[in-house]
Structure formats: C-alpha cells, structure tokens
Amino acid sequence: MAKRKNITTTQLALMTAAAVISLRGLPMMAQEELTMFFYIFFATFLFLIPAALVGAELGSAFASKGGGVYTWVKEAFNKHLGFTAIFLQWIQNVVWYPTVLGFAAASIAYMIGMPGLAQNGLFVGLFSIAMYWCATLVTLRGTSAISGITSKGFLIGTVLPGIVVIVMAVIWMAGGNPVALEHIPDTVSQVVNIDAAHHVHPRLFPHITGMSDIAFLAGILLLFADVEVHAVHAPELDKPQTQFPRAMFLAALISFGLFTLGALAVAIITPYDQINLQSGLFTTFQIVFDHYHIGWLSNVMGLLVAFGALAGVMSWISGPSRGLLWTAQEGVLPCFLQKTNKNGVQVNILVIQGCIVTLLSSLYIVMDDVSVAFFLLSALTVGLYLVMYMMMYAAGIRLRYTQPGLTRSYRVPGGNAGMWAVGGIGFLAVLFSFIVTFFPPSQLPVGSPATYTWLVVVGTLVFLSMPFIISFAMDRRKGANTTGSGK
C-alpha cells in the first residue's frame, strides 16, 4: 500500500488562512477604526482558535466515517441534531452567497468606471442572481476548469489586492497625505474619545452604551468562520498533537495580520463617512490611485477582486451541499434530493439552493440602502452558523464522556478539563455573538430598528425550524410506509 503523503505545519496554516481571509470584511473592520483591534482579538482568540482545536479533535476521531459536522453531532447526540448541524452549515453558506456576490457587483461597478452602480440595489440584485445561476450551470457541467479558477482566485483576487492596499497606505503616509484616522467626526462616539480640550482621539476600546454599538462583532466573527473545514486534515500531520496547535496559531497570526493591516490601510486612506460596507475597499483604491494619477488601476483592482469573489463562489457552490447529499443517501432527506447528474453533481439540491439565493438576493432590490441589506444578510448568515458552532462545541465536550475510548489522533490538551475550557470559552463567545446579531448596528442607517430585528429573528427562526420540520416529515413518512408494509 502506498504511503500516505503528509502535509506540513506551514501548509496546513496557509490552507486554513486561505479558507478564512476575505477582502470583503476590510471595510466593516475599518469602520471600527482603532477599536478594530478589540473585535479582531475577540474573533481570533475566542473563536478562531477554539473552533480549530475542537474541530481538529472531532475531525481526527471520525475522519474515516465522513459526513463532517453531521457525523460529529450525530455521534454525540442523535441523527436529528446531526442533520440540523449539517443543514445549518449548508444554509448559512446559501445565505452567504448574496453577500459575496454583492461585493463582486461592487467590484464590477468600479471596474467599468461606474462606482455609483455599487449602491444601485437593482444592479447589485440582478448581478448577484445572474452570476450565481451562471456559476451553478458551470458547476453542473462538472468542468475541469473550475479547479484552476478557484486555485488562482485566492492568490490573484485576495492576496494581491490585499498587499496592494497595504503598500499604498504606507506610500500614502510616507508622502505626508492626510491620515483619515486622525480626522474622525466627533459624532461617532463609538470609536472616538473627546478630551477636556475638545480634541478628538481614536478609541482603542469601543464605547458601549448598548448592544447596537458592538453589532459589527457578529459580522466580523463570520469573517473568521470555516476554520473547521480544514480541521479534518489534522491526522495528515506527522505529529498532530504538537503540529496542529502550531498550524492553527500560525494561521491565526496570518489572519490577524492581514485583516488588521488591510483594515488599517482602508481606515488610513478613506474618510470615515466614505467607508461603505460593500464598496469601501474600492473607494480606498479610487482615492489613492486618483491622487497619484493612476486611476486606471482602480479598474484593474476591481477586476481582480471580482475574479477572486466569483472564484470563491464557484469553489463553495458544490462543496457544502454535498453534505446534504450525504444525509440524503442515508435516508434523512427525501429521495429526490439524492439525484445526481452524469458528472456526479447533486443537481436537485443545487436547484433548490439557487432558488433560495435568488430570493435572498432580491433584498438588494427591495431595500433602500444596499449596505443595510448587505449587513442584514451577513447577520442572518452568522446567526445560523453560530448555532452550528454551539452544537459542535457541545458535541466535542459530550463525546469525551460518551465515547472516552474513541481513537483521536489529535486531542485538545489538558484532558477533559482542557476540553471544557477550550470548548466552554468558544461556546460562550459564540453564544454572546449570537445574541448580538439581533441588534441593528448603530453605525448604519437601518431606518426602523424594530423592522431590522424582526427580519433577523424571523429569518433565523425560519431557517432553524426547517431541519426539524424535514426530520419530522421524514419520520412520519417512514412510519406510514412501515405501517403500510405491515398490513
């Protein structure tokens, strides 16, 4: 038998960083100015690292069974909760698509030299719908070109523009240009402090008068999600027990560095009132490139970022839904969802997925402010994902007691107490962030806070109830079939 090819600590760290890092979050963090350090620290040390460590133990324990989070939660509790976990992982990804497609729409708007389109809800909505269905059609064909596109997307569409914006910020400051961080309006009390002499200074810790002042925490947390996707590779390390924590801390350091430097670059160049959640990065490019009379580079950056965003959609469009296909083949979902085409692609699941994305993308069209729609979708996405993470932490703790003899090539250090500490900290951080998602951010013109909260609550409840309704319906159908067979 051929020897398995192991991966190195650095390779796993880079794989994890690639799954986590996205440029679309830079404007959101930049709006927090220097208080971004509080949010990034919270997301890195109370979410990213605990999720990676617990995910690694679960992934190494059930690597041979497959099914990911479905298997982890099913083994800890039951198949209904396992299905709920994989369903939430899938549906949050479905809700995520309109946010990244909205970001791609803004990229295209700047690429064609019409930045105003980035705030045109009709353009953003129709672009998101059209691009998603195009990506779905390509996925259904099973073309080999997809792998090449997605492998280059991170490097060309994320790393390169990220480095460019950081370098341009350094050049901007070295040239003696105004630093936007030093000219924040005194009305933004969450991120500035006014001393006795009425001088305005950026805060390092957010001024919190209510949950709305830290509502961006939920959206920032989402930027650090998906680390558990690569936790299953822990057994492929030569020494998982020592190498995996090092890989995760290295990935956390890379993510912390790129997110922090990139967001700082946006905050340094772009005036506070021009930082837009969806198109703030491109405003930064436009300001700095126009200043140095190379405005055409804004179009180039728009093209690169759009390529990276669309490549990201194509890389995820089939993957998470395969988890649902796996549960369908186990009889947890209706038989028609088991259908695959000649390329082995789960066609019916992707069609349903596309219909949901179309409906959610329509929010850009019907809502007055594109940024509010963008953040609303982000809040709904992170709320669903955080519930799945709570289930994952609970599964990790419970399995230490229900299956203590289970072979784990990687274990969270410190015995059961260590698992309680890591899993408990992660669970509490996620629970707090989940509560925050229901509060509208004070930094955005949401109009009616009650309407915003109502939309998030209803959307979360609808998607949370769906796996239970499906499980109940499938159990009733099986019961009816069993009774019918007995007659």
Q: Where are the language model's segments positioned?
A:
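Loop-to-transmembrane helix boundary motifs in multi-pass membrane proteins
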Residues: 4-13, 94, 122-129, 238-242, ...
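C-terminal membrane-solvent junction of multi-pass transporters and transport-like membrane proteins
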Residues: 3, 135, 152, 337-343, ...
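Membrane-interface loop-to-helix entry segments
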Residues: 123-189, 225, 248-252, 378, ...
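Helix-loop-helix junctions that connect adjacent transmembrane segments
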Residues: 37-38, 118-123, 152-302
